[in-house]
């Protein structure tokens, strides 16, 4: 088994991941499939600080194509096109809104001290943003945000 998978499984067990998702994690054969599971369980993962920013830094820092961002400073607006985008310890400006080609409005999650400004992409929609403790978001230029707070149990 891969080192990343061993770590994910150990932390999932220690942090009380439900049996169904734990079994799904055991079946993950690639980082991409593990990321999909992470994004499907993102509320639980962020509430429990799973798997931890240290693991994300070490094993998933190259996962921007999958909507996982870590330690990024966006000087120029970064266009967000994923259905779920998770930012760990990120700062700067992102652009979000309706993705007409994919017919989605992204759900944006900020964790581990992320502070982002979100600007619109030209469509009048409301973008949901989920904030962990210690994170902040500012709406800019033609976007409406619906902000939810994720708290540690």
Indicate where each model-derived feature is located:
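Short, glycine-biased loop/turn motifs at secondary-structure junctions and
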Residues: 1-153
